Amino acid sequence: MAKCEFKSLPDAKLQRQRNTSFSFSYDEINISETLSNYAKGKTYYIHTYGCQANYRDEEIISGILAKAGFLKASDENADIIILNTCAVRENAEDKVFGKIGELKAIKAKNKNAIIAICGCMVQQIHIINKILDIYKHVDLIFGTHNITDLPKLLDEIILKRNKIVDVKSQPSLIEENLPSTRLSSFKAFVNISYGCDKFCTYCIVPYTRGKERSRKMEDILNECRELKEAGYQEVTLLGQNVNAYGKDFKDGTTFAKLLEEVAKLNIPRIRFLTSHPWDFKEEMIDVIAKYDNIMKYIHLPVQSGSSEILKLMGRRYTSDQYKQLVTLIRSKIKDVYLSTDIIVGFPNETEEQFQETLEMVKFAQYDSAFTFIYSPRNNTPAAKMTDNVTREEKSSRFKRLVAELEKSVSASSMAMVGKTFKVLVEGASEKDNSMLSGYTEGNKLVHFKGDLSLVGKIVDVKIIASHTYSLIGELING
């Protein structure tokens, strides 16, 4: 059995602390002769779970491996297999454990294959212990704060054939000039910040992603300029809380100022994810309204319509404050589309508090929504709360919430019928490969007949029919 070397392990106490000693690095990734020789003729495969930030991490990991000389494989029959994981909910973790188990057969066929687990899940010590105890075929575990150590870690595995665990509790660098293999040739994710300082009581992200750290504005703008010059049609600015961007600079830098500078680059489409209502200022609303190339789509997670539950969640706003923000957004941004996240079954949520959430849904008239039953996360304050809400009641409330949401989502889709919208074509429809699919500026999915040569282009599509979560259209002047 291979020896396991523990380089660093996550510490929940350290993860709660806000380390402010990080710095900026512009050093390029170095690839050793050992790794480049090993990579010749070998392949890699990455399976990513979770949010857009994880997919951006995949692009960087892929870029590092490509720089070393590895070729990208289309399936798990590869020489390096990496699972890039998500820890937001238990269901996501269960999927990862299932996949790790499946990889045992791959390892049996190719004993020299290197199986690695990275991402948010392994920022938790109990997850690392479970992997080491049960899944003996895993060779490498590394965290969210040391992706760029991957070449050195692979060097050691190749030379020593050891297992390695290297998961740091806190970040120390914001690294620029990283290699990247983009997942799309026309849509791009651009990190503007990392981490979160909000510490909502149910959320694991501040522990797995660390303190809020903003990239320098000029570095972000340079990346966006390069994407514009390369012909990208859409750029999404990413952060766990984008509208807290710049708070760590102490020089008056704000997300609104960054967003305006990005808009001036004339990239056809600009989006951003994700916003926290507490930091959503009127200055930001005005910038969105001002520029046509900033999509009139805002993801504004409410989580609950009850002020009492919001307080228990540590969300920092009341139900009335959220409603005032929605009213302000709709008054200033014409034809804005709103989406949200909602959690039902938070510990001790009463029926009356749940009814307040249903009332919020009726008030906000969301165009789309992501709904979840509360999932306890290890070491978070909410996980330690007593909970008298039964599983059956949580499930019932979830179904009732979805039914209420579908009313506004369906109404939003039906209101688009007969109108023409600009759609960025993403590819063949997953439901019917004889059709194309793409998204409107308001992030509505549209299926329509058209030639594959239109992929990556923005076209005019008239909506002729609606379903709750998608639309049917016909190409104009196609």
What are the residue ranges of the model-derived segments?
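Terminal RNA-binding accessory module
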Residues: 2, 7-14, 384-478
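Thr-Gly-centered strand-to-loop micro-motif
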Residues: 118, 369, 448-449
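Glycine-centered loop/turn positions within well-structured domains
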Residues: 148, 198, 243, 307-308, ...
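Conserved, mostly hydrophobic/aromatic
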Residues: 200, 220, 237, 272, ...
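A structural motif corresponding to the C-terminal lobe/cap of the Radical SAM core domain
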Residues: 293-296, 308-424, 436, 457
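Proteins enriched for Cys/Gly/acidic motifs involved in redox and nucleic-acid/cofactor modification
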Residues: 2-245, 283, 320-331, 355, ...
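Short flexible coil/turn linkers enriched for glycine and charged/polar residues
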Residues: 183-186, 196-198, 294, 304, ...
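Conserved SAM/AdoMet-binding glycine-rich loop
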Residues: 112-117, 124-126, 229-351
